[in-house]
């Protein structure tokens, strides 16, 4: 819903390159949650979307790193949390490489249900995201 993205009291942010072109967006807090998940533990929820033309270009790791750095500076959380559709393999791989791990899964949707993973990561200086780190072992 475009109207929701434009609400000033929501935590959506456009991300632009140096030339002013749209790279993607991010959101924080309840705006990044999916109905049906258990969000009882204190953590900063993070959602993102990379411009479709930029997917697969190698920008996603830096994109996520910048979003996490912004979220850490603005909100000072102890943990980051992300909710990702199980079918979104690229996004799951991105978050896992950034040190997130799956803590739950659930179904969401009234008409057509989709399974989601909730992933968590501690915010700690010694655990900063390194885009050159090796990918974790593949999840079964």
What is the role of each PLM region?
Residues 73-84:
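Conserved GNAT acetyl-CoA-binding A-motif
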Residues 120-140:
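Conserved N-terminal entry element of GNAT/NAT acetyltransferase domains
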Residues 54, 58-67:
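Conserved acetyl-CoA pyrophosphate-binding loop and the N-cap/start of the following alpha-helix
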Residues 1-53, 70, 122-123, 138:
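Acetyl-CoA-dependent GNAT
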């Amino acid at each position: 819903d475009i109207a929701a993205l434009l609400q000033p009291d929501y935590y959506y942010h456009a991300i632009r390159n140096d030339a002013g072109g749209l790279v993607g967006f991010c959101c924080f807090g309840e705006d990044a949650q999916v109905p049906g998940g258990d969000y009882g533990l204190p953590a900063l929820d993070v959602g993102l979307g990379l411009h479709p033309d930029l997917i697969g270009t190698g920008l996603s790791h830096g994109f996520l790193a910048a979003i996490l750095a912004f979220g850490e500076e603005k909100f000072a959380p102890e943990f980051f949390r992300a909710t990702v559709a199980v079918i979104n393999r690229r996004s799951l791989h991105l978050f896992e490489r950034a040190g997130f791990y799956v803590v739950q899964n659930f179904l969401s949707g009234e008409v057509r249900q989709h399974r989601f993973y909730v992933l968590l990561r501690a915010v700690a200086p010694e655990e900063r995201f390194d885009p050159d780190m090796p990918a974790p072992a593949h999840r079964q």
